[in-house]
Amino acid sequence: MKQFHLSIYIIFFALPSWGSNLQNAINEIFPNQIKVYGVKIIGTEITPPKDIKKAARILKQWLDNDGDEKPDNSLVVNELIENNAILAMGKTENDLEESFDSLIDVLEAIDVDVDNFERSLIGLISEEPNIAYLEEILHLVTQVGYANAYPEVFGEFKGSRISKAMDIARGGFFKKTPKVYPENSWYHYYDKSCDYSCMVTEYFYWSLTSLLGAQINRYDEISEERELNTPKKMERDKLMMELLKHKKYQIPKRLPSF
């Protein structure tokens, strides 16, 4: 696999809608920063540069899956940039949480819409295993990129095509997490903190990574949440397979290499 040479350096992000106070806070709280095709990765002071570089390699491969040094889907990348998508990294859970809290304090002090800001931000703990890098970075790409580029298809709301596929996978439409999923379901996430849009985000991740082979040896670990863990089993999810394989959307066809 081609090696990517990436450098970590301070970037003063252009955030005209939020102002210089927020920009300065981001630079102070998350001083280790890099961009991948214009998409921002920011890390706390103690986040190891090697881990930020690893995240950058993964993001680059999710966006440029065919390795031709340009994004596969410019619409998706444009939405990531337009919506100020940010991957925020901390070395440990405590490091990331404290840094988030500090940033939220700044947002509230300068009267920024916290909910709107958080919708475009995904957190990643650098000490987590590789599978977490695949998951959280893909969440950023799908939640901020694909969902905004193709809302009628990948929008994280009832009525989009991916939501219809998910409702089949869950055994029906459930606005809130049910106590028990139907027996015919193969996607049954019981985290009550995960609302309907969150369920769509997770469903996209499980579907794509199962199709690409990331979950083959993890059935015992993940079956309580996800049963279709192999490319062969994914054939059962016909509607989602149509979306994942449609040439128009340029969905990644191979897993990123670490």
Place the predicted regions along the sequence by residue.
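Post-HExxH zinc-binding segment in Zn-dependent metallohydrolases
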Residues: 146-220, 236
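A general structural signal for short secondary-structure junctions and capping/turn motifs
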Residues: 2-3, 76-81, 194-197
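Pan-zinc metallopeptidase signature
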Residues: 201-258
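Acidic/His-rich structured neighborhood in mature extracellular/periplasmic domains
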Residues: 27-29, 36-182
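Sec-dependent signal peptide recognition
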Residues: 2-10
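Conserved aromatic-histidine-acidic binding/catalytic patches
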Residues: 43-47, 125-129, 189-201, 224-232
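Catalytic-loop region of hydrolases
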Residues: 22-23
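Hydrophobic h-region of N-terminal signal peptides that target proteins for export
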Residues: 10-19
